[in-house]
Amino acid sequence: MNPLRRKRLLIILAILAGVGIAVGLAMSALRENINLFYTPTQIANGEAPLDTRIRAGGMVEQGSLKRSGDSLDVTFVVTDFNKAVTITYRGILPDLFREGQGIVALGKLNADAVVVADEVLAKHDEKYMPPEVTKALKDSGQSRLARIRSLPRRAK
């Protein structure tokens, strides 16, 4: 084989190997950082994987928030108006976290079907709802507008 051809072939093989390694590393990083969103119904039906980082979201049920007296542990229930799932969190909740509001919790589902969250995200204004939560509520036949319309009206 001609020395010039051999040199070109080695350069091409080195470039291909480098591109292959770069693609492999990128795919590995993406696989580790993907947190799939699951609704409370999907979690209750067993569709969410155990011990894998997921995002769970919905509306915080009224009266479900329980704070520990001696630590930062918090337990609350999130619903999509079909099913509900319990979420535990250790830390300070966001200032905008309230019962009856939409949230997304990032954490792992344990064998007791409880999401152990390490991060809780709350909506940041009155009109905003996380896209995943909005879609889940629409899929369940519930929406904020439908809930508002169902509230009793005040007499004038």
Curated annotation (Swiss-Prot):
A molecular-function term among this protein's GO annotations: heme binding
InterPro entries given in the database record: CcmE, CcmE-like_sf, NA-bd_OB-fold
Residues that bind heme: H124, Y128
Top-level taxon in the UniProt lineage: Bacteria
Periplasmic topological domain residue ranges: 30-156
SUPFAM superfamilies: Heme chaperone CcmE (SSF82093)
Predominant subcellular localization, coarse grouping: membrane
GO biological process: cytochrome complex assembly
GO terms for cellular component: plasma membrane
Transmembrane segments: 9-29
Record topology, Cytoplasmic segments: 1-8
Keywords, ordered alphabetically: Cell inner membrane, Cell membrane, Cytochrome c-type biogenesis, Heme, Iron, Membrane, Metal-binding, Signal-anchor, Transmembrane, Transmembrane helix
Annotated localization: Cell inner membrane
Membrane topology per record: Single-pass type II membrane protein
Pfam families noted in UniProt: CcmE
NCBIfam families noted in UniProt: PRK13254.1-1 (NF009727), PRK13254.1-3 (NF009729), PRK13254.1-5 (NF009731)
HAMAP family: CcmE
Role according to the record: Heme chaperone required for the biogenesis of c-type cytochromes. Transiently binds heme delivered by CcmC and transfers the heme to apo-cytochromes in a process facilitated by CcmF and CcmH.
Name by which UniProt lists this protein: Cytochrome c-type biogenesis protein CcmE
Record organism: Pseudomonas fluorescens
